[in-house]
């Protein structure tokens, strides 16, 4: 990124420590989310991989419609001092859906079941988009930094899942 910032007179800052995340997922997650926001979170207004700023449970948040679980789901990021309030709002609103908490290890297990790779765990900076299968997310009709190299990538290596069928576990 640094090699291109001067061309566009921009700066960037890592703000990871300014946000903490929660995830809601499952077939009723949209209904739950709609109960705690005034924004329209219908499929047509908040599509897969969309990101929005909105208030969730009265808390300013960044919401991403994406999930490692293999189900409909959302990642919600808030300032650390709002995380407990948001969690309590979600759990209260989710009672009618029989909501249950799940942790990071469960989430990581579910992402493996759906073959959804994670940066630094499964993917490294030296892997190409084609090798990881992430090239399906590239809009080749747009210009972007690295497009020329990405188009040249005709390598034969590709990460694939290994699925073992067993009846004795």
Regions found by a protein language model. Give the residues of each.
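Conserved, structured C-terminal
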Residues: 1-169
């Amino acid at each position: 990124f640094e090699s291109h910032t001067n061309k566009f007179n921009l700066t960037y800052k890592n703000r990871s420590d300014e946000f903490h995340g929660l995830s809601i997922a499952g077939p009723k997650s949209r209904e739950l989310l709609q109960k705690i926001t005034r924004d329209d979170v219908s499929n047509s207004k908040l599509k897969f991989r969309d990101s929005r700023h909105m208030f969730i449970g009265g808390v300013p948040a960044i919401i991403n419609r994406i999930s490692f679980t293999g189900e409909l789901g959302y990642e919600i990021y808030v300032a650390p001092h709002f995380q407990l309030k948001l969690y309590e709002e979600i759990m209260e609103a989710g009672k009618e859906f029989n909501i249950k908490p799940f942790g990071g290890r469960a989430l990581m297990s579910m992402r493996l079941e759906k073959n959804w790779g994670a940066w630094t765990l499964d993917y490294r900076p030296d892997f190409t988009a084609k090798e990881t299968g992430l090239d399906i997310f590239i809009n080749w009709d747009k210009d972007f930094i690295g497009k020329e190299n990405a188009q040249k990538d005709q390598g034969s290596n590709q990460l694939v899942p290994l699925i073992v069928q067993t009846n004795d576990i």
